[in-house]
């Protein structure tokens, strides 16, 4: 099934006047940057001499709420657990497991709502208090909707148990009766309390007949004239047939018993048993499901779905799921009475009673301020195999689309982005691509955060992103003159060009300071040394110094010569290498053979005689600078002396 959305509603941004100024904008992962240009909209060539304003518009502001972040964190664990549980779900246990997951989600919502309620009470700023109270109302509505969806779509309660679930639903979400009960029972004479009959009526409206009977017994004790009527009505409440969870009676048996009980209630009403007490008579009419009497108690029920469940309890307790929408629509119409229009919450609940899952999700997406609710509910319903046929026109299904939107919002937050990674992982169609796009936009403020991002990319074989992140960190390290860190990141990125650049910086620093920094890193390059010629040279040149320091002069001389003759050393560094050869040439023992000395002499003359090319001031300075000339002369003298010594030594060895 494909679905095309209608035109989105226009959102007005305070302070932005697009009629006077031309606007430009840029989308980010979780927000939009909007700014006024310097051009007048009516005449683009005329510049407006005023300072433009910049606006940052966030679409998912809820991620910045400290309390809601707990909701996101807790539900993330439930979500991941559900995805991993999918392979184990089968048979009868599947439904029980899914119901358990749904209740876990609801418990997280309720815990968050209760904490938000406490914060709202403690708020000193009236504006903050109103904001928190508004958020409490939203969370309450979310739990209300989720609970109903759990009953209808996940529990799939049949006729009979369906009403029991709906009664629990109403009792859970219409809880003013508890505070009312505490007030009445806490008084010296409960039956004389001004809210006594309101309390009894609400208890009957919610089907809490045992509690209602206890209240009537207090009235009977306090008013002997009403004792008989209270006893009769209490007996009717006690004998009302209700299908309890452990009861084995069939629906047919229940309907027969209920019909007999109803006839007895009608008989007492016709006999004017309660005529002397209007309150008791009203209660009897409620138990008969009299709609006019029920509507008189609108204020006590406060909403139409309470009216619906009470109406079903006393008129059709074995209602079938397929008939729910008829009762729901008529209850809504009767309760509103044409005086007001349905609210968004009413439309969502009505869609649920009509078993229109897609409409529920669509209405929730419009009404709620973030994607958390619809993303997790849709995912759960998808695991119930209720959404397989619903594909969107741009190549994804509804579950994946909503999860992608939710995860994108998480990436706008400095720490919640880590949760978003798992949501992308469980989107088989577009999750990988979306993760790649979003992870590149994470600001790498600290090395610790960068390592987290890098680990995530490496675990998912995101080679391109790994390279990109390593290059960014290498550049930052170079700018901060942390050459060891820069070299480490360039090696990790397998970036030969950048490794060459950093190696050059190491060599330049050596020329200026006469020693290497980050020796541990250079000494342990290992196979990474082969990433670039310059890095290889750096590693080998450091090895030359180590051999020299260990007085392994023969090995050091061979390595130095190989660095020059193999052309791996940059020509600009040849003079440094030849200068490093001087101490070896001056040793008492002959280190360089005649052949090796000839090679060094060739390199020196090649360096001294090569004509500098245009734009190479370093080579020009080689001939012009007196210091360099002195070095060349010293090297020639040392090489000549070493050659003579080597020839004599080699001749002596041959003669012997």
From Swiss-Prot:
UniProt cross-references to InterPro entries, sorted A to Z: Nucleoporin_Nup85
Keywords: Acetylation, Centromere, Chromosome, Cytoplasm, Cytoskeleton, Kinetochore, Membrane, mRNA transport, Nuclear pore complex, Nucleus, Phosphoprotein, Protein transport, Translocation, Transport
Listed GO CC annotations: cytoplasm; kinetochore; nuclear envelope; nuclear membrane; nuclear pore outer ring; spindle
Keyword Protein transport among UniProt keywords: yes
GO molecular function list: structural constituent of nuclear pore
Keyword Cytoplasm tagged: yes
A Pfam family annotated for this UniProt entry: Nucleopor_Nup85
Organism annotation: Rattus norvegicus (Rat)
GO biological process: one example: positive regulation of DNA-templated transcription
Subunit structure: Component of the nuclear pore complex (NPC). Component of the NPC Nup107-160 subcomplex, consisting of at least NUP107, NUP98/Nup96, NUP160, NUP133, NUP85, NUP37, NUP43 and SEC13. Interacts with NUP160, NUP133 and SEC13. Interacts with NUP37, NUP107 and NUP43. Interacts with CCR2.
Predominant location category: nucleus
Modified residues (N6-acetyllysine): 92
Residues that bear N-acetylmethionine: 1
Purpose: Essential component of the nuclear pore complex (NPC) that seems to be required for NPC assembly and maintenance. As part of the NPC Nup107-160 subcomplex plays a role in RNA export and in tethering NUP96/Nup98 and NUP153 to the nucleus. The Nup107-160 complex seems to be required for spindle assembly during mitosis. NUP85 is required for membrane clustering of CCL2-activated CCR2. Seems to be involved in CCR2-mediated chemotaxis of monocytes and may link activated CCR2 to the phosphatidyl-inositol 3-kinase-Rac-lammellipodium protrusion cascade. Involved in nephrogenesis.
Alphabetical list of PANTHER family matching this protein: FROUNT PROTEIN-RELATED (PTHR13373), NUCLEAR PORE COMPLEX PROTEIN NUP85 (PTHR13373:SF21)
Residues that bear Phosphoserine: 223
Subcellular localization(s) per the UniProt record: Nucleus, Nuclear pore complex; Chromosome, Centromere, Kinetochore; Cytoplasm, Cytoskeleton, Spindle; Cytoplasm
Family: Belongs to the nucleoporin Nup85 family.
Protein name: Nuclear pore complex protein Nup85
């Amino acid at each position: 099934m494909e679905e095309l959305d209608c035109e989105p509603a226009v959102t007005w941004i305070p302070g932005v006047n697009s009629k006077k100024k031309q606007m430009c904008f840029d989308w980010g992962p979780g927000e939009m940057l909007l700014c006024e240009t310097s051009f007048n909209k009516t005449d683009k060539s005329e510049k407006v001499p005023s300072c433009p304003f910049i606006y940052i518009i966030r679409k998912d502001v809820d991620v910045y709420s400290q309390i809601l972040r707990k909701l996101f964190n807790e539900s993330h664990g439930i979500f991941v657990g559900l995805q991993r549980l999918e392979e184990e779900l089968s048979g009868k246990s599947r439904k029980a497991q899914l119901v358990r997951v749904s209740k876990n989600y609801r418990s997280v919502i309720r815990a968050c709502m209760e904490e938000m309620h406490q914060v709202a009470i403690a708020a000193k700023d009236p504006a903050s208090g109103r904001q928190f109270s508004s958020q409490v109302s939203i969370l309450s509505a979310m739990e209300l909707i989720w609970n109903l969806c759990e009953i209808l779509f996940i529990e799939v309660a049949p006729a009979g148990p369906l009403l029991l679930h709906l009664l629990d639903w109403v009792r859970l979400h219409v809880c003013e009766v508890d505070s009312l009960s505490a007030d009445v029972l806490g008084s010296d004479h409960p039956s004389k309390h001004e809210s006594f009959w309101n309390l009894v009526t609400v208890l009957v409206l919610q089907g809490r007949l045992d509690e209602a009977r206890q209240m009537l017994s207090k009235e009977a004790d306090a008013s002997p004239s009403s004792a008989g009527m209270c006893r009769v009505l209490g007996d009717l409440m006690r004998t009302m047939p209700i299908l309890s969870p452990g009861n084995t009676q069939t629906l047919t048996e229940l309907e027969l018993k209920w019909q007999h009980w109803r006839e007895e209630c009608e008989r007492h009403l016709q006999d004017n048993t309660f005529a002397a007490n209007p309150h008791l008579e009203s209660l009897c009419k409620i138990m008969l499901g009299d709609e006019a009497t029920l509507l008189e108690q609108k204020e006590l029920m406060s909403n139409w779905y309470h009216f619906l469940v009470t109406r079903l309890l006393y008129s059709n307790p074995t209602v079938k799921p397929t008939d729910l929408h008829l009762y729901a629509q008529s209850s809504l119409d009767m309760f509103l009475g044409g005086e007001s229009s349905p609210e968004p919450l009413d439309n969502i609940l009505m869609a649920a009673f009509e078993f229109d899952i897609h409409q529920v999700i669509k209405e929730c997406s419009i009404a709620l301020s973030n994607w958390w609710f619809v993303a997790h509910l849709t995912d759960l319903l998808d695991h119930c195999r209720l959404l397989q046929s619903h594909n969107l026109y741009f190549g994804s299904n509804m579950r994946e689309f909503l999860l992608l939107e939710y995860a994108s919002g998480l990436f706008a937050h400095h720490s919640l982005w880590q949760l978003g990674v798992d949501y992308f992982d469980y989107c088989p169609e577009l999750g990988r691509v979306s993760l790649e796009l979003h992870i590149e936009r994470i600001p790498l403020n600290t090395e610790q955060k960068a390592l987290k991002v890098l680990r995530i990319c490496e675990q998912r074989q995101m080679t391109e992103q790994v390279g990109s992140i390593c290059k960014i960190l290498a550049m930052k390290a170079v700018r901060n003159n942390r050459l060891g860190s820069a070299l480490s990141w360039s090696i990790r990125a397998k970036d030969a060009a950048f490794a060459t650049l950093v190696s050059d910086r190491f060599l330049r620093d050596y020329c200026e300071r006469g020693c290497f920094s980050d020796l541990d890193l250079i000494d342990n390059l290992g196979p990474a040394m082969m990433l670039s010629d310059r890095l290889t040279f750096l590693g080998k040149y450091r090895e030359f110094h180590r051999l020299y320091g260990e007085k392994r002069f023969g090995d050091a001389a061979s390595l130095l010569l190989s660095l020059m003759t193999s052309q791996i050393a940059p020509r600009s560094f040849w003079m440094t290498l030849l200068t490093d050869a001087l101490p070896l040439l001056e040793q008492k023992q002959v280190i360089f053979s005649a052949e090796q000395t000839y090679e060094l002499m060739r390199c020196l003359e090649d360096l001294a005689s090569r004509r500098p090319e245009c734009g190479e001031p370093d080579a020009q300075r080689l001939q012009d600078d007196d210091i360099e000339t002195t070095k060349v002369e010293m090297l020639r003298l040392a090489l000549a002396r070493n050659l003579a010594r080597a020839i004599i030594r080699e001749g002596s060895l041959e003669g012997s």
